[in-house]
């Protein structure tokens, strides 16, 4: 199963955004499954590719099961892909917002692979599942955690990270940066960041130190998984998490996916790049509204829309 779309010549310059882990909620995608044949086909293909009923966990929970990486990651991806297919099913060509670029936050970068034709839905699902397991194995080998630091200059926080042996793992906005590392290092970094003027420090409820050097054990297995699959050049450029630059070839995307598992997510840089190329409208596709909120804090001129169900798709038609 491959996701495809036509393009139109005029209208606003649109970027698609795809959320990452943390956006999950029990019941997500159920309304799409019940009311859209195209969306239901995505969910069924994901279940078939995994060899188990992920949809049961998505629609019924319990929340603790959905929060597990092996369920949350393919689940968020499935809902985002189902949203795209439901958009195509319900909107005419002149109503369908066509992206000139795409970006996904961490896991969301994998969703972009399927939407831009780099991989089909089945292979994307399998790769996300393998990535999730490799990350979990790395977490078991190198236990750690993450914290959000609000209101501290990036250079100052990078110095805190160096002094405490942790990593800057997500630069979401100028005011919201996430750090990752072992539990002792993160506790020390939170105290030091607060002492140096951070407005707020928040311990995150996560299963590991994602996007840090503690994820290095996942790289070898991820390389092997990626090389076993048939990658294609994207039909729409994907902005890389690690560099904020556009990816236009299969080889560059493979390199990015390997680097991303232990590298910093440069979300602010990615948004700055997209707006610099003329993007004025962002559509966050999938559960949650975190990415749109970040984009708005990065640049208030940005127009934000969210697609998570049929009602939000119909709003695109009216707008």
Task: Label every PLM stretch briefly.
Residues 2-156, 281-314:
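FabD-like malonyl-/acyl-CoA
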Residues 268-272:
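Short hydrophobic/charged patches on amphipathic alpha-helices used for structural packing
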Residues 203-206, 275, 308:
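Short glycine-rich catalytic loops that host catalytic nucleophiles or stabilize transition states
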Residues 315-319:
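Short amphipathic alpha-helix with an adjacent loop that forms part of the alpha/beta core around
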Residues 194, 275-278:
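Non-catalytic positions within long, well-ordered alpha-helices that form the structural scaffold/packing
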Residues 106, 230, 278:
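Conserved functional loop/turn residues at catalytic and ligand-binding sites
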Residues 21-23, 50, 115-264:
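Alpha/beta catalytic cores of group-transfer enzymes, especially the acyltransferase/condensing modules
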């Amino acid at each position: 199963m491959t996701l495809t779309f036509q393009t139109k010549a005029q209208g606003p310059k649109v970027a698609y955004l795809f959320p990452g882990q943390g956006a999950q909620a029990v019941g997500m995608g159920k309304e799409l499954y019940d009311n859209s044949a195209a969306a239901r086909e995505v969910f069924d293909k994901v279940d078939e590719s995994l060899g188990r009923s992920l949809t049961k966990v998505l629609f019924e929970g319990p929340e603790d099961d959905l929060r597990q990486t092996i369920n949350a990651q393919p689940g968020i991806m499935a809902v985002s892909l189902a949203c795209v297919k439901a958009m195509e099913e319900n909107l005419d060509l002149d109503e369908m917002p066509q992206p000139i670029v795409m970006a996904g936050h961490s896991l969301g970068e994998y969703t972009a692979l399927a939407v831009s034709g780099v991989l089909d839905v089945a292979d994307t699902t399998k790769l996300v599942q393998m990535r999730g397991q490799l990350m979990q194995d790395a977490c078991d080998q190198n236990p750690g955690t993450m914290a959000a630091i609000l209101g501290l200059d990036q250079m100052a926080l990078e110095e805190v990270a160096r002094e405490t042996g942790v990593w800057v793992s997500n630069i979401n906005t100028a005011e919201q940066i996430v750090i990752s590392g072992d539990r002792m290092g993160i506790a020390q970094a939170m105290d030091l960041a607060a002492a140096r003027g951070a407005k707020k420090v928040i311990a995150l409820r996560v299963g590991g130190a994602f996007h840090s050097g503690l994820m290095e054990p996942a790289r070898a297995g991820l390389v092997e998984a990626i090389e076993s699959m048939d990658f294609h050049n994207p039909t729409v450029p994907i902005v890389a998490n690690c560099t904020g630059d556009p990816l236009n070839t299969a080889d560059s995307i493979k390199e990015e996916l390997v680097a991303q598992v232990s590298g910093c997510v440069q979300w602010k840089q990615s948004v700055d790049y997209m707006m610099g190329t003329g993007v004025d409208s962002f559509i966050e596709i999938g559960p949650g509204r975190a990415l749109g909120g970040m984009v708005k804090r990065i640049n208030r001129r940005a127009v934000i829309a969210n697609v998570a169900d049929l009602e939000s798709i119909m709003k695109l038609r009216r707008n």
